[in-house]
Amino acid sequence: MKINVKGVPETMIQTLYARAKETSKENPKIKDEMAVSIVKQLDYDFSEANEDRTMSLGVIARTIVLDKMVEEYLNTHKDTIVINIACGLDTRCYRMKGKYVRWYNLDLPETINIRKQFLKETGPIYQIAKSAMDESYRDDIQYHGENILVIIEGLTMYLSENDIKKMFSIIDFKNSTVMVEVMLPFVVKHIKEKSIEGSRAQFTWGIKNGKELEKLTPSFSFLKEVSLVEGMKQLMPIYHVLGKIPFVSHVSNKIIVLEKHI
């Protein structure tokens, strides 16, 4: 199946390929058989993604870290609705099946149109074809006071500060927890990924830490942050040593956890 996407939406194809490639290894650190299946159906030039080791390692490290964080949350919050913002072709909802009440995959209409071709989701997994900055998406969520877990990965680095503020202002459910991936401003400015540049997507925004993000989103409280170095430790043992160097941990992308209680 041939697909034609450019810019930020194209990054979902590259991250999908990274997960499929890792899954196909003899001793994979993650297992995403659905990614393998989708990649086999795609008529797409994966050469740049195949050669971009930096991007691939980052995607797998992020998957390792977020899978662990999401599963731990769901294991202790049985009554939870998950909102996966900028879902792309993410398949975490299937790896976590049975641990949540409902799961909403939200992304731009062009992305959801592609997702629908491979993943038929009609409950308890649902699709919402809207922007994270479109407050009307809240009307598409069946909500009766359950815990809300919002996952935002691979998105904030392509937004503006105003976008970030808008996106968080829309998340006004009570008892909301947000797990959001962020990039350091230094990395936004100086680090390039071959496959990302090839898609014409550009990094545009970064933030130093969770406390700084809390200042931008005053209705949320900073809880903790986890460096993707924790995932890299499973991929490359040398990171058990490198991770102790403050600069290495600092410069890596992080998953920041914020909470809102109304």
In which residue ranges do the predicted regions lie?
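Short, glycine-/aromatic-enriched active-site segment of Class I SAM-dependent methyltransferases
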Residues: 185-201
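A short, conserved alpha-helix within the catalytic core of class I
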Residues: 158-173
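A short SAM/SAH-binding and catalytic strip from SAM-dependent methyltransferases
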Residues: 148-162
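Short alpha-helix
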Residues: 200-230
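Rossmann-like AdoMet
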Residues: 1-83, 87-130, 143-144
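Conserved beta-strand signature within the Rossmann-like core of class I S-adenosyl-L-methionine
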Residues: 172-185
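Short amphipathic alpha-helix with an adjacent loop that forms part of the alpha/beta core around
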Residues: 136-145
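Core SAM-dependent methyltransferase catalytic element
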Residues: 231, 235-262
